[in-house]
Amino acid sequence: MNFGKKVWLIGNSSEKSKKTLNKLSKILKAEHFVFDDINPEIVISVGGDGTLLRAMHMYEYQLDRVRFLGVHTGHLGFYTDFTDEDLFEVVEALYDENPAQAIHYPLICVQVSFTDGYQIVRHVLNEATIRRASKTMVGDVRISDYLFERFRGDGLSISTPTGSTAYNKSIGGAVVHPRVKAMQIAEIASLNNVVYRTLGSPMIVAEKDTITVCPAPEDDYSLTFDQLTFEYKNIKSIEFSLDGTTISFANCAHTPFWERVSKSFIGEVE
């Protein structure tokens, strides 16, 4: 018996995902799982990594009591352990799933402070980025209390270890195992010449350190929190930290990290 385990399903708009979600819903209902979108124990994403990220942000303020499981219906699913052909295996895994054995990945806490004193706080699973809405971005970068550099360029990306395989990798960042509790800063098209100078390489920042970016407050900026994009003015500072918040994945046939990396980017090695 599943003892009325509460689940909720979130899918993307593709026809394949819709069909998979409907089929899985029927199987779960037949097995007497309880569907609860307010206080689910397990959120099942059906689609790809973007769907999983959307699901995480929908339950961003319940992460201490929600676990996630991914079913991918496309070509690449870094956060997903099952395919659309594994639906009965999904049900078996949900029966066997033990909350005490959940897999936890760290999230980055992003605190945005504005010149009028207003603040917003978000958490990201992959990365947060800051860019100028137009022209070159200029901003001081502090590591904890130390003024490290004055950055000039298109922008900055700050990623988690699991997010190191996403946008961070595409701009030359390193791939970092989730057991390494750290953040990574990667530059987006920095200016480096005889007048302006940045480090010019990705940086791994330790767990207890904070990263603070102080951009010119009069400019317009585009901030992303994973797949979410917002436009802001009058930003005083943006602080990035590992505050202990994690996302929990149901430990159901969970694929080891390096196996995920190999399958996602390299394929079969002969």
Swiss-Prot record:
Which Pfam families does this entry report, sorted A to Z?
Answer: NAD_kinase, NAD_kinase_C
Q: Where in or outside the cell is it found?
A: Cytoplasm
Cofactor(s) the record lists: a divalent metal cation
Q: What is its main location?
A: cytoplasm
Please provide the Gene Ontology terms (biological process) for this protein.
NAD metabolic process; NADP biosynthetic process
Instruction: Indicate the residues that form the catalytic site.
Output: 49 (proton acceptor)
Name the catalysed reactions: NAD(+) + ATP = ADP + NADP(+) + H(+)
InterPro entries noted in UniProt: ATP-NAD_kinase_N, ATP-NAD_kinase_PpnK-typ_C, NAD/diacylglycerol_kinase_sf, NADK
GO terms of molecular function: ATP binding; metal ion binding; NAD binding; NAD+ kinase activity
- Output the Gene3D superfamilies linked to this UniProt entry: Probable inorganic polyphosphate/atp-NAD kinase, domain 1 (3.40.50.10330), Probable inorganic polyphosphate/atp-NAD kinase, domain 2 (2.60.200.30)
Q: What class of enzyme is it?
A: transferase
GO cellular component terms? Answer: cytoplasm
State the EC number(s): 2.7.1.23
Q: Where does NAD(+) bind?
A: 49-50, 54, 126-127, 152, 154, 165-170, 189, 227
**Record's keyword terms, sorted:** ATP-binding, Cytoplasm, Kinase, NAD, NADP, Nucleotide-binding, Transferase
HAMAP family noted in UniProt: NAD_kinase
Q: Which family does it belong to?
A: Belongs to the NAD kinase family.
Show the NCBIfam families listed in the entry: PRK04885.1
Q: What does this protein do?
A: Involved in the regulation of the intracellular balance of NAD and NADP, and is a key enzyme in the biosynthesis of NADP. Catalyzes specifically the phosphorylation on 2'-hydroxyl of the adenosine moiety of NAD to yield NADP.
Protein name from the UniProt record? NAD kinase
Record the organism.
Lactococcus lactis subsp. cremoris (strain MG1363)
Which gene is transcribed and translated to give this protein? Answer: nadK
